[in-house]
């Protein structure tokens, strides 16, 4: 059956800021309390969407979540009118106001794990929103994520949108940032690859400096609820040493697409066994695994973390060749730039490298891959997505003007205490729901 991989990028929200909330994310910590530019952040992401759509790739957009989250602040004991809640939180616990104001839902690679209909037992596309329970500012996202996905993918005969797994450390789930899929063609049955950092109940190596956010138990639960074939599901442990070096999700150290795995040589525990298992599973699905392993001598783990070489999008063109979408930081790192030149000049599947300015997102630890959720859809499934979320000339122009109208070009940590920011954000989001035709998506609209 004919199918295409669509990328749904998160639109950066009006409260984009640098609060340093993500322990284990080096960029986030290094840029704590810097002044952010929400308008630039949103436009940088939108330009990437538009350019990829212009190149013929299926490109959708997911709306921001409502921030600041008054629901969280009230749950934490702050009371009164909305402005009073914000003022009390700013005075008594500014760190909680920062968590409630985070625009981290922009990184939709963490929104959910997605399995296409070709892989699932019931022939539907399955979505499991990630519980993101390792961080407060992200643990509040999954309910709104489920609501958004249920709105966009509303046809229950074609789509199954699950609740997130129970938010406990044993089931820590970070979504598609630790998942990829290999296949001969998008519409044919493939092999789903789940990467975890630790196991709650099995003994094994664990990082010592930074937390492992994804558990084996969570990955297995997602695979089981999606109805994946056991012989076409592969689990791998990320090397704990690279987690301690700042690789907080697997998409910071490897990326896969179709029959290609682009990875650092230090990405996995027992890597050869993983390659062999993937090769055998994919062989049974009519494809041969192509591993492009970047040696540590050419690009160190530190180079990978600072440049986000592997937090790239690996996209297939109609002719079968692949293009690597990287942030401009890759061109600013001499080792990474040299490797990319070598890669593009070779005879491998990756023939082209596209470079994007995503500086505002990158300063918070989010590159091209963080900003997108991959959803493989058949023609009929794509037609069932009736909201106005597919990027084209018209939608790009409307969204660009919407950002220009509603977003600030400067947001410092102290600005989160401004009650006008809540009003501005709600006004913007209310208008956005009309643009995207998604109905009353937000709590304040209900």
Curated annotation (Swiss-Prot):
It comes from the Bacteria. The keyword Transmembrane does not apply. Substrate binds at residues 19-28, 110, 137-138, 213, 251, 364. The keyword Hydrolase applies. Keywords: Arginine metabolism, Hydrolase. One of its GO terms (biological process) is arginine catabolic process to succinate. It catalyses: N(2)-succinyl-L-arginine + 2 H2O + 2 H(+) = N(2)-succinyl-L-ornithine + 2 NH4(+) + CO2. Pfam families: AstB (PF04996). Its EC number is 3.5.3.23. One of its GO terms (molecular function) is N-succinylarginine dihydrolase activity. SUPFAM superfamilies: Pentein. Pathway: Amino-acid degradation; L-arginine degradation via AST pathway; L-glutamate and succinate from L-arginine: step 2/5. The active site is at residues 174, 249, 370. Belongs to the succinylarginine dihydrolase family. NCBIfam families: arg_catab_astB, PRK13281.1. Catalyzes the hydrolysis of N(2)-succinylarginine into N(2)-succinylornithine, ammonia and CO(2). Homodimer. This is N-succinylarginine dihydrolase. It comes from Burkholderia multivorans (strain ATCC 17616 / 249).
